[in-house]
């Protein structure tokens, strides 16, 4: 049925991705050899083919493509707990590395490897009954996930124009920087994602650190803890595809409900309940509690504060046995109480869906996906750092040396600034200013604000 093809690229993407597969295997009762060992077969196996192919001998193989320009991360996945579950041919890697250089990932090293990746993608897509879309895990600060990741997305876009393209993109953090050239890599990537992706879930390490530190009370969070948060959200977004629920959603329904204008498809995500290990027993999980926490700005997995902007749209995905009526009441309640944080020219702009099966170890849980104009803070911050370096042409020789042109940087910069301006325009728009926005969104959005 409605299959999703999962692709992970670069070190960050592969680490998030392998954590995601651990979570999904756990939810569906698949052990590390790919065999089913769960307890509720009818629920866990009914729609297992969203993420798995069934191989001979009753083994379930993830529909995943793993790519990287150096073998390191792949080797550690292979030797990790779920390393044997993946199809060996689906590991595609080079030896050279992209050295945190977007141009290497997009134009030189990545371009050499891309055909091998596309062959595997085609093979997996041909095995599907009715492919729904692709989900890509990558970071935007490095070279492989950002450069080669966006190259792959644009190639897939060419070949499968009518399939959904969902990305989980880790943005550079405001205070924590891994690489000096992050602003370049991120800006060049956003330039691609605006055009070629349908939905982007925006994540960043700093916000995830804050959640681990403040909410989960972990004194020294590891990347594993951060990736666990991300994978909880990833599994939440697709849970109503994988389990029977009362109010279903799929990638396309999500997009239709969340994207009022085609370029504004960068979402904030959150998850509830997040509790520290010690305090779990003192917390009663009720729909109001979940709702309260999932709309909390401290819960957002990217460094933008939803209180600084307004929600164009949002989607709440609840999991567990609960009354749909109560869910609807709570969502309505949030909208009425905080009406100033929602744009008034899209009435009822929160979609909810309910799925019966909660995540492992919880009675109920909720995943939040919001399209808020405050996401522009992320872009604005990266853009300022980009401009500071680009004005002096710092580090540019690494990119031009791989055959890039300065013009491409200028274009990416202005595209990102246009995006910020568009978000700002709709943040300021009110329901009664009809005359001003007759400009059709189809032109590339370069009008003055």
UniProtKB/Swiss-Prot annotation:
Domain of life of the source: Eukaryota
Compartment list: Cytoplasm, Cytoskeleton
One GO MF term: mRNA binding
Binding site residues for GTP: 11, 70, 139, 143-145, 205, 227
Cofactor: Mg(2+)
Gene Ontology CC entries for this record: chloroplast stroma; cytosol; microtubule; nucleus; plant-type cell wall; plant-type vacuole; plasma membrane; tubulin complex
PROSITE patterns cross-referenced by the UniProt entry: TUBULIN (PS00227), TUBULIN_B_AUTOREG (PS00228)
Binding site for Mg(2+): 70
Biased composition (Acidic residues): 430-449
One BP term from GO: microtubule-based process
Any Pfam family the entry gives: Tubulin
Tagged with keyword Magnesium: yes
Main location per the UniProt record: cytoplasm
Purpose: Tubulin is the major constituent of microtubules, a cylinder consisting of laterally associated linear protofilaments composed of alpha- and beta-tubulin heterodimers. Microtubules grow by the addition of GTP-tubulin dimers to the microtubule end, where a stabilizing cap forms. Below the cap, tubulin dimers are in GDP-bound state, owing to GTPase activity of alpha-tubulin.
Assembly information from the UniProt record: Dimer of alpha and beta chains. A typical microtubule is a hollow water-filled tube with an outer diameter of 25 nm and an inner diameter of 15 nM. Alpha-beta heterodimers associate head-to-tail to form protofilaments running lengthwise along the microtubule wall with the beta-tubulin subunit facing the microtubule plus end conferring a structural polarity. Microtubules usually have 13 protofilaments but different protofilament numbers can be found in some organisms and specialized cells.
Family to which this protein belongs: Belongs to the tubulin family.
Identification of the protein by name: Tubulin beta-5 chain
Organism: Arabidopsis thaliana (Mouse-ear cress)
Gene name as annotated: TUBB5
